[in-house]
Regions:
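Soluble, non-transmembrane catalytic domains of enzymes that act on hydrophobic metabolites at membranes
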Residues: 1-10, 351-353
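Helix-enriched interaction subdomains in cytosolic or periplasmic regions
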Residues: 17-38
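Soluble catalytic domains of membrane acyltransferases
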Residues: 27, 31, 43-216, 232-233, ...
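Short, structured interface segments
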Residues: 214-228
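Cys/His-rich short segments
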Residues: 238-291
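Structural motif
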Residues: 265, 344-346, 378
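Long, charge-rich boundary regions
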Residues: 277-358
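Acidic, Ser/Thr- and proline-rich intrinsically disordered linker/docking segments
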Residues: 365-425
Length: 425
């Protein structure tokens, strides 16, 4: 999938009129039928199945909030298989509307910006649930999982649940990540996919529970490990390309601690600095003599610890020359030139376009980062911005910095929150 783009000067892009808010439309049944038919083609090879738990507690025509984990591009087709012919709106990022705004609205999509405060989104969700009596599907993680475990959820999601006061349904998939992990260069594997569809809470239960209780329940529900699931269920993934791109995720060698010198190719993960090599076996384990890690999420968690130490020591810093695309409307992604992206304990600083662009974003702007691999087949991307404009930054050296930057944003946010919290006496 690609995105419509244009080359335009920075001044002209920033002078473009911003789209006015429009209330979301009730999904057109005919289009949802088309999506359902198309989803059959993708789901048939996965032998998709799902189980429901407690769904009888929800009335047949009662609108609900559907919360689904975000594992791969197949997620929306899974939702169509589960809920069709029930009509539901979908909370979608604004980039998905580029070049197809009307179509997305007719499907029932509600636009929002990833990891940018958006009170309008809450009003739109409330409008669909209360006024249009239409369910709303939302991916609370917002971003795809990098390592097959849950992406951190925004704190106080319970406040949103309390405000909407409708039944909450969760959809947790298994196998969708393993079939098409984000790092694996869009190469699909032969993996069966299943899902658990659960009534997490009725409207009455949402009303009775506290925000903290709802947050805790969500954290428990969105707690999973796709690699562990593969291992425990002895799921065989024997494609010869299964380690392709794994260096995007595991960028730091645990033996020599060199960063950016690891290559994931075929079934091997090799450090070009010290020569240490790991094999990714058919059950998702890493194998090597004197292996530091055998479980991919453990390696990823170790990298998180290393970044935490760098932040605490004041030694962490990212500085990259980047190609810059800006999104200010749904007509196109606008290429405006090049610049420098810096990230340190003070947050992000993006400069470029011959000195015309100078944007800063503090470390408390968001709990995580909008980052992606091979975004719309362009390249690995780091996205920052606000409601006025989103800045898509593509490292010119194609280095493996996306995962590290996301980890750094998450750990820096936690550190700043801790320091900001009042000290109890």
């Amino acid at each position: 999938m690609k995105i419509k783009s244009r080359t335009l000067s920075y001044e002209k892009v920033m002078a473009l009129p911003r789209p006015r808010h429009r209330v979301p439309l009730k999904p057109m049944f005919l289009l949802q039928l088309v999506i359902r038919i198309l989803s059959i083609l993708d789901l048939f090879p996965t032998k998709f199945t799902f189980k429901t738990h407690g769904m009888e507690k929800i009335g047949k025509n009662e609108p609900c909030l559907i919360l689904m984990n975000h594992s791969s591009f197949i997620d929306l087709k899974i939702a169509s298989r589960i809920f069709f012919p029930k009509r539901y709106s979908i909370v979608a990022t604004t980039d998905a509307f580029v070049g197809k705004n009307l179509l997305m609205r007719l499907v029932g999509c509600i636009p929002t910006q990833k990891f940018v405060s958006d009170m309008t989104l809450i009003k739109d969700m409330e409008y669909m649930l209360k006024e249009k009596r239409t369910s709303v599907l939302m991916f609370p993680e917002a971003g795809y999982s990098f390592d097959g475990t849950a992406t951190p959820l925004p704190r106080k999601m319970g406040i949103l649940l309390k405000k909407l006061n409708v039944p909450v349904v969760t959809v947790i998939t298994q196998g969708a990540f393993a079939r098409d992990p984000l790092y694996n260069c869009l190469q699909k594997r032969k993996v069966n996919v299943r899902a658990d569809v659960t009534c997490m809470a009725t409207a009455q239960q949402v009303k009775e529970m506290t925000v903290a209780q709802l947050d805790a329940l969500l954290d428990k529900t969105f707690s999973f490990d796709n690699f562990r699931y593969q291992q425990e269920n002895k799921i065989v993934i024997d494609e010869p390309f299964r380690a392709d791109g794994l260096n995007r995720l595991l960028y730091r060698c645990p033996h020599c601690h060199t960063e950016g010198q690891i290559t994931g190719k075929g079934v091997m993960l090799t450090c070009n600095a010290c020569g240490k090599a790991y094999t990714l076996d058919v059950h998702g384990y890493l194998a090597a003599e004197e292996a530091k890690f055998t479980h991919i999420p453990d390696w990823y968690a170790w990298q998180r610890q290393q970044i935490r130490q760098e932040l605490e020591a004041g030694t962490y810093k990212l500085e990259k020359e980047v190609k810059i695309g800006i999104l200010v409307d749904t007509k196109a992604l606008y290429w405006v030139g090049s610049g420098t992206l810096t990230h340190d304990e003070n947050g992000f600083h993006l400069t470029g376009c011959d000195g015309k662009l100078d944007y800063t974003q503090g470390p408390l702007a968001c709990h995580t980062l909008n980052a992606d691999y091979y975004w719309y087949e362009i390249g690995d991307v780091i996205c920052i911005g606000n409601k006025d404009a989103l800045y898509y930054c593509f490292p010119k050296d194609h280095s493996d910095v996306v995962a590290k930057t996301r980890l750094a944003v998450e750990e820096l946010y936690k550190l700043k929150k801790q320091r900001k919290a009042p000290v109890s006496v």
